[in-house]
From Swiss-Prot:
Superkingdom field: Bacteria
Molecular-function annotations in GO: ATP binding; proton-transporting ATP synthase activity, rotational mechanism; proton-transporting ATPase activity, rotational mechanism; sodium-transporting ATPase activity, rotational mechanism
EC number, UniProt record: 7.2.2.1
ATP-binding keyword on record: yes
Phylogenetic placement of the source organism: Bacteria, Bacillati, Bacillota, Bacilli, Lactobacillales
Family: Belongs to the ATPase alpha/beta chains family.
UniProt enzyme class: translocase
Catalytic activities: 4 Na(+)(in) + ATP + H2O = 4 Na(+)(out) + ADP + phosphate + H(+)
A Pfam short name: ATP-synt_ab_N
Keywords on record: ATP-binding, Ion transport, Nucleotide-binding, Sodium, Sodium transport, Translocase, Transport
Name this polypeptide is given: V-type sodium ATPase catalytic subunit A
UniProt-annotated binding residues for ATP: G232, P233, F234, G235, A236, G237, K238, T239
Gene: ntpA
Main function: Involved in ATP-driven sodium extrusion.
Organism name: Enterococcus hirae (strain ATCC 9790 / DSM 20160 / JCM 8729 / LMG 6399 / NBRC 3181 / NCIMB 6459 / NCDO 1258 / NCTC 12367 / WDCM 00089 / R)
Amino acid sequence: MQIGKIIKVSGPLVMAENMSEASIQDMCLVGDLGVIGEIIEMRQDVASIQVYEETSGIGPGEPVRSTGEALSVELGPGIISQMFDGIQRPLDTFMEVTQSNFLGRGVQLPALDHEKQWWFEATIEEGTEVSAGDIIGYVDETKIIQHKIMVPNGIKGTVQKIESGSFTIDDPICVIETEQGLKELTMMQKWPVRRGRPIKQKLNPDVPMITGQRVIDTFFPVTKGGAAAVPGPFGAGKTVVQHQIAKWSDVDLVVYVGCGERGNEMTDVVNEFPELIDPNTGESLMERTVLIANTSNMPVAAREASIYTGITIAEYFRDMGYDVAIMADSTSRWAEALREMSGRLEEMPGDEGYPAYLGSRLAEYYERSGRVIALGSDQREGSITAISAVSPSGGDISEPVTQNTLRVVKVFWGLDSSLAQKRHFPSINWIQSYSLYSTEVGRYMDQILQQDWSDMVTEGMRILQEEEQLNEIVRLVGIDSLSDNDRLTLEVAKSIREDYLQQNAFDDVDTFTSREKQFNMLKVILTFGKEARKALSLGAYFNEIMEGTVAVRERISRSKYIPEEELAKISSINEEIKETIQLIVSEGGMTDD
């Protein structure tokens, strides 16, 4: 173990001499307290160390010990339902050890419980040839997630001994004869967080991730293995969008990284998720969630590590063949941590003081998402969907973090403060936002629903865009200058906005909408527009149609509160629309109003 001496302390940056044998990315124990740090720069024998804990009270002359290991996470049974800090220390154990509600310094804790016994069920027999990524057995970690035990990277050989039984994560469960000799496998692996886990092949992401949020699933979908950004000013609803996706998306596992945001938001997750039921499995949402909490009052440097810790845990479960979603809230705070460390290292600043390598660091993170075939002989498919909030100051999306993010993600959900002020949530602006997965998702949904989903989505978006143009005319010369056809367009667009896009995250029914219900709701609104337009062409007046369809339009607006089990009620509105408008045409028609 290399032992150096501190020569300078500057906030989270510590410089130490006599470190010639240490390497970049080595973990260090800094000072007499032994706080955790990581070497980020070497100049001759002087190492610059970013410290993941508070450095007050540490001074020159104190020792620095290099461990010779990179910042790594422990991967094994016991990860799910846990809450970790940015360097994978379990917060509940931390509290028991320190007897404090705040993080103590210099406390070394294992990430996983090394004494708990897990029942291991072997799925292969002795004499089987195995290589990296092959599954040798499993542990039922929660009611939802079967934790598959894989052969670690770099090991290939014949199974000499394996048995089912109750083991800790440190007990040998399997012996493999390799070219280098006998290797004992345990249920735990370690993996450096800054290195992506290897895969066999990357696939095209073309299966939509159903989030239950109508504006996202219909107009701006994200696929399993895709990457999405949610930029928006303060109060626009970024965190609620992230929470909704974490709650209701049809993935197997969610990794939620609270990176530099308010502690109350993580508390909400901890309080809400155990009580909420996953519509896909019928079990508690906490049974499929991993939380990484790095709130705004925690050390800045640990924010930078928390994103990598989260994506490495996500990759581990992806390699088992699971679909994983990782939420980072927010990458702006992570970028601010990069900016602070860069400033203390006296590097040349880029735009707005961010380091010149901001774009490449963001790209490194997002490129670890994707739909893949994992290592192993059974062609397992898994995916990581990366969804990150971006908090541009003042809502200015031309700032560097947002711009560099938009270069690498394919979905942009732009939150609009003016919509939020009107209490239109989710406040995703349908004119600014986009998804480059729309074509693939449209094809997929047409096949699944056996219906013209993509045509309906195109028609709905055309109406919303037409409304934007008509609003310009209305602002200039007033609504009376519009033709009946144009006034009908405004009414249908209003119905799409208020009855379809607007969604109440705190209503038991409206919080989640299945794709079948979304299809039926959108079809009802477009059917009203189509039938009303037909009535106009037959001579009915706009005012006649609006007065005669008050009851049916009321039913359309209430359709979002119809439970999933009663979808036939929504379909029945289509017939009611046709009958009502036919009655208006037969009774009114060319009569003057």
